């Protein structure tokens, strides 16, 4: 096979594959964003559910932070809190594969992340209403 044809086929195939991956990422982004908005934006959701979803919120922010159009101060607060959360979870002592009971900082950081999630969700709803 001619190397030019082979190379062009490879480029086309790569672009198609890349487009499919981006479309899947867009669907995943949209689905997870909606789920987290329901968790943190709905006042009828209990605090325990919000605490259980902190890890999902952290993973979502890590993966999609560049796609989130937040104000600079909100972005900075989120980055600071998530850095602190990761530091505290890295320090957590595991007993038989589960985190040990007690501790002061990790629950406090989780509380701040839950409050930030609620604030971000309300900001998102405000923007949606204004549009």
Curated annotation (Swiss-Prot):
GO cellular component, as recorded: extracellular space
Entry keywords, A to Z: Immunity, Innate immunity, Secreted, Signal
Domain of life: Eukaryota
InterPro entries linked to this entry: Turandot (IPR010825)
Alphabetical list of Pfam families matching this protein: Turandot
Signal sequence, renumbered to the chain: 1-23
Family note: Belongs to the Turandot family.
This protein's name: Protein Turandot M
Organism: Drosophila erecta
């Amino acid at each position: 096979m001619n190397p030019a044809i082979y190379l062009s086929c490879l480029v086309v195939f790569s672009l198609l594959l890349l487009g499919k991956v981006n479309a899947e990422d867009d669907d995943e982004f949209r689905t997870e964003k909606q789920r987290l908005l329901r968790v943190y934006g709905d006042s009828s959701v209990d605090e325990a559910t919000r605490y259980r979803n902190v890890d999902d919120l952290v993973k979502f922010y890590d993966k999609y932070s560049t796609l989130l159009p937040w104000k600079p101060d909100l972005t900075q607060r989120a980055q600071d809190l998530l850095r602190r959360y990761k530091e505290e979870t890295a320090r957590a002592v595991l007993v038989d594969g589960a985190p040990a009971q007690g501790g002061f900082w990790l629950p406090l950081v989780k509380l701040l992340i839950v409050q930030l999630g609620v604030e971000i969700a309300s900001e998102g709803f405000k923007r949606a209403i204004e549009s």
